[in-house]
Every structure is written in C-alpha cells, then in structure tokens.
C-alpha cells in the first residue's frame, strides 16, 4: 500500500494538486491561526464538506481521499503560514499557484518564497528529508492514533485530523523545533563554538535543568527504538552537510557535529543508568529547515506533510484487515464490593 501511495506522484501532479474553488479565500484566509498545525487540521476537517462521498470507507474511496490529502498538504501548510504572516504579523501576502510539473519539495519551496526561486540542491535535500519522515511504523503516537480512530469506522478526514492533533504535541512532532531553539539558546551562552569545555558545560546545565526550557533534556538525542544509531539521521547528516557547505554555513554545521559527539559523553556522566544514546532524525532537521529559510512555524507541518503518506497507508491497512475497534485493556486495583441498593439515594 505504502509503495502504491508513494508511486502516485504523477497522479498527484496531474489531478489533485489543487484545492476547491475559493477554499484559500473562504477557509484559510478568513480565520487565521498562529499555530499552523491547528490551521491544517481545521482545513482537513473542512475538506470533508467538499467531498460527496466523505463518509464512504470503501478501500477505493479511501485511497482516493488519501491521495488527495497527500497532494494538498503542502498547500495547506504554506498557505496557512502566509495567512498568519500577513494577518497577524502584518507582512506581505503571497499566494502562488502550485505548478503541476513540480515535485512536493519543489512546490513547498516555490509557494513559500516570494520570488519562487530555489536551487536543485535545495529541492533535493528537502525531498530527502520528507522521504525520511514519511513513515516510521505503527508504534509512534500519531500513527497509532490513526489506527485507533480508523478502527471506530470514522471517515478519512476525521482520522487524519486526529493524527495531526497527536503530531502537534511537543513530545512528538514538535521535537525538531525544540532542537533549533535549543541551539539558539546555546549560542547565547557559548560565544566560542569551538570551545568544547564550554559546550560540555552548557550540555550539563541542560541536563541539570538550569538553561533553555529547564526540562532536563538534550533535544535531538536518543530514541525509543534506535538506541545505537538512527539510520535516518545518518542519511540526513550527509545531505545537510552538503547544503551547509553550499550555503556557506560550515561553522554552524560544525557546531552541530560537536554537540552530537559531546552529548552522549555528558549524558553518560550524568545518568546513573546509561545504555547508550545517539542523535535522532530531529537533530539535523531544524538546521536543514533553517538553511532553507523555512520559518519555525512550518517545521512540524512539514513533518505532517511527509507523514500523511504513512498515516494513509496505516489507515488502509486497518480497513483492509477489518479489525475490531481498538480499546485499551484495563486492570482494576480496587476491591470489588457488592452493590448496595439505595446507597447513593
């Protein structure tokens, strides 16, 4: 299913990379939000009203709905940001039309930038990042949410909106933004980026809840599954390095590499139980988006633009398997008591 969805790029370009007439004006521009994930979720739920077969959960119809949503997610994300940037920040409004010949990465860069200009390297690196974020099994929070909500028999738009609500949380899709802001805070405390003692001191203060958000976390380090290394991060590392060299940001990339190398040592010294930790895919994602001049408000929406493909595949899988409704098992730790008639009257 997943390969079929990914392989439908030409179908997306030719037929579905467009929103209903006046949708941008009547929905996206009318009630702007300062949170792009909220904006996208609202738009997805509103698209239900434009679908004559919105509640039809047959496989063919759901596949059609999923392909349409995959195709318009870049538009919902970027247009939502432009609406916010104009109406709430009083900046110029840019609403470009998506070209059917462009890839998803090219559409994002073209719609986002006033002059629509981007380099082939920029598009290639962003495309790689989207692919790496596209799917990560059924155990992550938003994908599991898709399974749970789909098992109830609800429509595609409601299931995707629920997945968006999950990804919106800072413990899930918001991690790449946290990494970026953490490094911005590091730069305020450490003036010499080559001073490894100063870097280690800052990392220790992070773990001691003395700096940044005081949560005791080094964002971008560690993963529930990838405890030795995150293969997605290793691929992204090389791509971001090429882009940083091309854009003249060698020093900043070197800073990220130093923190990636030093953080496991600091965590090993500070934690009593230590099984190893490595940088995850979020570690370099924020730097990549920064090098592409993508605003922080769009970091998590770009995650969603990629992950909608995985959600779609898992929704179809759940429907094809015709499973029962998913509900958690519960264990009561209270003592059972015989019901006393009239006890609460």
Where are these regions (language model features)?
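Conserved phosphate/anionic-ligand binding catalytic regions in large, soluble enzymes, centered on
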Residues: 153-181, 218-219, 223-229, 278-314
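Short alpha-helical scaffolding segments that buttress acidic/His motifs in well-ordered protein cores
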Residues: 9, 13, 27-28, 39-44, ...
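Accessory "access/gating" subregions that flank catalytic or transport cores
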Residues: 84, 88-161, 166, 181-276
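Domain-length cofactor-binding catalytic modules of enzymes
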Residues: 249, 255, 269, 273, ...
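Active-site cavity-forming subdomains of large catalytic enzyme subunits
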Residues: 20-84, 128
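Catalytic or ion-translocation cores adjacent to nucleophile or general acid/base/metal-coordination motifs
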Residues: 176-209, 304-333
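Single conserved hydrophobic/aromatic residue that forms the stacking wall/gate
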Residues: 1-7, 12, 335-338, 342-345
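An N-terminal structural lobe/cap that precedes and organizes the functional/catalytic core
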Residues: 8-9, 13-22
């Amino acid at each position: 299913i997943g390969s079929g969805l990914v392989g439908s790029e030409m179908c997306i370009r030719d037929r579905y990379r467009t929103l209903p007439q006046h949708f941008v004006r009547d929905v996206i521009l009318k009630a702007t939000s300062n949170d792009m994930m909220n904006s996208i979720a609202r738009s997805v739920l509103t698209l239900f009203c434009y679908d004559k077969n919105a509640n039809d959960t047959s496989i063919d119809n759901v596949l059609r709905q999923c392909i349409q949503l995959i195709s318009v997610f870049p538009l919902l994300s970027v247009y939502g940001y432009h609406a916010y940037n104009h109406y709430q920040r009083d900046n110029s409004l840019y609403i470009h039309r998506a070209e059917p010949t462009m890839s998803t990465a090219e559409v994002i860069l073209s719609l986002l930038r006033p002059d629509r200009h981007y380099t082939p390297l920029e598009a290639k690196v962003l495309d790689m990042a989207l692919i790496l974020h596209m799917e990560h099994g059924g155990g992550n929070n938003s994908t599991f949410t898709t399974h749970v909500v789909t098992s109830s028999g609800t429509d595609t738009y409601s299931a995707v909106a629920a997945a968006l609500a999950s990804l919106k949380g800072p413990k899930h899709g918001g991690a790449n933004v946290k990494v970026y802001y953490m490094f911005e805070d590091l730069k305020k405390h450490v003036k010499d980026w080559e001073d490894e003692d100063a870097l280690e001191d800052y990392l220790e203060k992070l773990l001691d809840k003395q700096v940044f958000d005081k949560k005791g976390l080094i964002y971008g380090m560690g993963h529930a599954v990838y405890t030795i290394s995150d293969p997605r991060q290793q691929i992204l590392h090389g791509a971001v390095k090429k882009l940083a060299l091309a854009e003249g940001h060698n020093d900043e990339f070197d800073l990220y590499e130093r923190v990636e190398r030093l953080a496991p040592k600091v965590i090993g010294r500070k934690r009593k139980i230590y099984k190893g930790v490595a940088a995850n895919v979020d570690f370099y994602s924020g730097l990549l988006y920064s090098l592409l001049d993508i605003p922080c408000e769009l970091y998590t929406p770009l995650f969603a633009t990629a992950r909608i493909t995985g959600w779609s595949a898992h929704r179809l899988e759940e429907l094809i398997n015709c499973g029962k409704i998913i509900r958690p098992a519960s264990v009561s730790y209270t003592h059972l008591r015989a019901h006393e008639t009239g006890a609460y009257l």
